[in-house]
Each structure stands twice: as C-alpha cells, then as structure tokens.
Regions:
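Post-DEXD/H (motif II) to motif III coupling segment of the RecA-like Helicase ATP-binding lobe
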Residues: 2, 7-70
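Conserved SF2 helicase motif VI
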Residues: 34-35, 195-201
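A short beta-strand element within the Helicase C-terminal
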Residues: 170-171, 178-193
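Conserved Walker B
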Residues: 1, 5-7, 176, 193-194
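Conserved interdomain hinge at the start of the Helicase C-terminal
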Residues: 81-119, 123-134
Length: 201
C-alpha cells in the first residue's frame, strides 16, 4: 500500500480502508506536512508504521527542489464588527470590496508569478479572478483554477507557471495547496482565512 499525501489518511473512509488491509505486506505513506499534533502522528503511524523524517524543507529549498520562502504579513485594518457566527465573519471578509481591491492591486503590482489562494469558488474565487483579469495588462496571463477544472488543465497551468515569469494563478485551496510544487513561484497571497497548518504549508 502506498499513500501519497498521507496526512489526509486521518479521514474515516481512508482509516476504514487501511484497517481492512491486514494482509498488506508493505505500507508506505508519504507527506511533507503533518498537522503538528501528536494524535495525527499516532494515527498515521498506526496505519503505516513508524515515521521517518528523510529531509527538511529548508534542505529541499537549498537543493532547488522547492521554491524559497520569505513571509511578509500585510495587516489590513477593518472597522470593529461583532458577528453572530463564523460564517457571518467569513462572508464579511470575502465580500469586502476594499479588501478584494487591495488583493487585486497587490497581485497586479507584484513582479513574478503570483498564486492567489481562496476557499469559495463562487463567493470569492470567481469575483477575484474577474477583478484581476479585467484590470491586467495585455501581456499578463491570469488563470482560474477550481475543482471543476480538469486535472490535465491544472497541470498545464502549473507547467506554464514554470516557464512564465509574470503569470497570476487564482486557485482554490483544494486544488493548489498541498501536493503542488511550482519552483518558479515568486508570490503567494492567502486571500481567504485559514488556520489549517497543512493547508498553509
């Protein structure tokens, strides 16, 4: 049994499948992103066996296998609001015109390939894509990726980004966060809030 992106094997369906593979002589799970909790590690070790750290992320960066990382936090100030639910707060954030215009201007001003990650296709991804695409220069390519885009088309966009130096990719977290490696990526903008360690790494 080989499990790629093994950190996702904590879901009930995959745990159920793995527990039925009692005759599997070999079990290999590969991931670059555990969620940092001991429980998650124990679940994966119960499914695959002892874990081994083969190489560190900074070593992969030094060897040129991963894009080098530099984090800049841009803090936007909003007028204080109280929200009844988390969903109300999310809707406020993703529908905030000044915030979305800031993201658009930032993406258009940044030099190099830029990846913009969002969580909701219709509510945030499509409006951001339209905003950026309608204001870009003619020589700049903007791509929109979500779960409805065929895998081969996603791969084409990734390949274009490897050879381009000024593309913008507006992509959902589910399609372009874990397991995607674009070495020629210069900027990442987290357009939607997320506290998932795996998603952010």
């Amino acid at each position: 049994m080989v499990g790629d992106e093994a950190h996702q094997f904590k879901s009930k369906s995959l745990v159920s499948i793995m527990s039925k593979l009692s005759d599997a002589k070999y079990r290999f799970g590969f991931t670059g992103t555990l969620d940092g909790t001991q429980t998650h590690k124990w679940v994966l070790e119960g499914l695959f066996g002892a874990s081994y750290k083969i190489i560190k992320t900074d070593e992969l960066m030094k060897k040129g296998h991963l894009a080098k990382l530099n984090i800049n936090i841009l803090l936007l100030k909003h007028s204080p609001n109280k929200f009844e639910t988390f969903e109300d707060e999310i809707q406020y954030i993703i529908g905030h015109n000044r915030r979305n215009n800031f993201i658009k201007n930032l993406a258009l001003d940044l030099k190099g390939n830029t990846l913009i990650l969002y969580a909701r296709v219709e509510g945030h991804g499509q409006p951001l894509f339209d905003l950026i695409n309608n204001n870009k220069s003619d020589d700049r390519q903007v791509f929109f990726i979500h779960g409805g885009v065929e895998t081969e088309n996603r791969e084409k966009v990734r390949e274009i980004a490897e050879s381009e130096n000024n593309a913008i990719i507006v992509a959902s977290y589910g399609t372009f966060s874990t397991g995607i490696n674009i070495k020629n990526l210069h900027n990442v903008i987290f357009a939607s809030p997320s506290k998932s360690r795996i998603r952010n790494l």
